[in-house]
Amino acid sequence: MNDATPSNSIPIWRGPFILSDGKRLAGIRDTRPAEADQGVLDVKTFNAIETDALFDEINRAETWIGQSVLYRSLARPTHDAQLLQKKQEALRELADNPELHAALERFVKQMVAGEESLYYLLYGEFNGGLATDDPKNKTEKLEFGGYGYHQFIDGTQFAVDLVEEADALPPVRSAYLRELIQAMVDFGNSRTYALMHGPIYVIDGKFKTSKEKPRYLPVPRFRPSMFKWLPILIFVSIVSGLYFFFQNMWAELGETYIGYGILILTVPMIPIILQAICSSDLKSVIYPLQKLFRKSPELAKAVESLGMIDELLSLHHYAKSVEGEMTLPEILAAGQHSLTVTNARNPLLARIQPDYVPNDIKLDAANRLLIITGPNSGGKTAYCKTIVQIQLLGQTGGYVPASHARLVPAEHIFYQVPEPGRLDEGMGRFAHELKQTREIFFNSTPLSLVILDELAEGTTFEERMTLSEYVLKGFHQLGATTILVTHNHELCERLSGEGIGSYLQVEFLPEGPTHRLIPGISHVSHADRVASALGFSKEDVEKHLATLPGKAE
């Protein structure tokens, strides 16, 4: 049994809770950024760095709430260094304590079986008639036949089991796990739990627990069943009284069959009366309790605790599933972003490509502006996505594919990629991209990570040089970690001459790029190699023209 008194309590909760207090069950991916509601990631960055694909790659969670928590950690990462450190402490405890890991796995698997029933209770709509166990359509409204009795029994039993199983977990060392388990145990002391555990009494339209009910007040408890013994007993007593009354009265007239006729006529009234009672239960008990349970912060917190434990197990299992080195980054609390990684591999490719070429990442105070040059298809974009995805995984508190890593959490991550112009905004590509860069610049701080895939495209060379130079100098003075991918080696030479920035280029051998980044500035793009590989070289164009009618010599 867990100690009821938490020590070293930390603020690990994020609001609002995932369990919605509305009438609709939230989707697993509902926490993705929106134009009007952004966090560390904006919408464009979220899409550009393939966050959904990253979730699919690392997701090993078994519960709906666990997957929702994990997705939120990626879509809306925290930049609280202390919280990430505590989360890592819990992951280390899982790795060091196989017995605890096994106990938590059993706990989550036990909860998976009944988790769905809780959501059916909280968000179900009941249409009467014959009861159904599964909703008609799980993607929209959770509509069921019946009056919600079955869902009430199973859903409340899940809540009871959650508390009992959590209380039976072995002691834990890490403050993060201790707080999660304690939240579930504490839910057992709440009024919501008392109502879910039962019995429930309805007095003057209000719900009372066994402790709240006046001791000597004879009030029947609510029974989630179509068969109500007290109403049935009253009805049978009335029918029996009428039967004997008419039977005796008509017996004096020699018409004893009249009593049997009355008895037969009353039988069809039984299901009508039961239906009326069930409809009353649904409107006056089930739905009001459903609303009360949905709005319970104690229940939402307990369910979220289950999800956060499942998330930890998922991060642990992901690390075990990848061949090669995996590490928990050292999390630093500082006023300026930094990221240093040894032998970094791309999180989306590390598992399926064991021979993936690793690269080091060094983004610190001395390397705050990094400019990457090199041939097309040489690995520049993959390197940039590796940087951002490792930063993102680090800010979930989880493992990253590398030998060693150290990072300061970023409060903003921006990734700008080339986009076409917007006709509805009346601007071409150059103006559209410049507007994006402007928004990124004015929202950046020293704790920001900014990646610009090309800059000031769509204008003359001279204007591009001037604009790119003052924009990059602006980011450098701002203190944001800034990475530019470009073919503009003249810009690199100009900034390098002023001692601004560090420079990497794609290593290129006679047989092609190695996908390794080395110091230096590339002066060639090897576009001819890419064109030849795609079958669109000068020779390919000439051969095609020669095959056209009237073009053959």
Predicted regions: what they are:
Residues 1-11, 273-293:
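Transmembrane-cytosolic junction motif
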Residues 1-231, 294-300, 305, 327-329, ...:
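Conserved amphipathic alpha-helical "coupling/scaffold" segments
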Residues 92, 307-310, 438:
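Structural signal for well-ordered, non-membrane alpha-helices
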Residues 96, 161-164, 168, 238-245, ...:
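Charged/polar positions within long, soluble alpha-helices
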Residues 217-287:
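Transmembrane alpha-helical hairpins and terminal membrane-anchor modules
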Residues 262-274, 312-553:
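ATPase nucleotide-binding head domains, primarily ABC-like/P-loop NTPase cores
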Residues 275, 289, 293-296, 300-303, ...:
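Short amphipathic alpha-helical segments with heptad-repeat character
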Residues 283-324:
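Transmembrane helical bundles of ABC transporter permease domains
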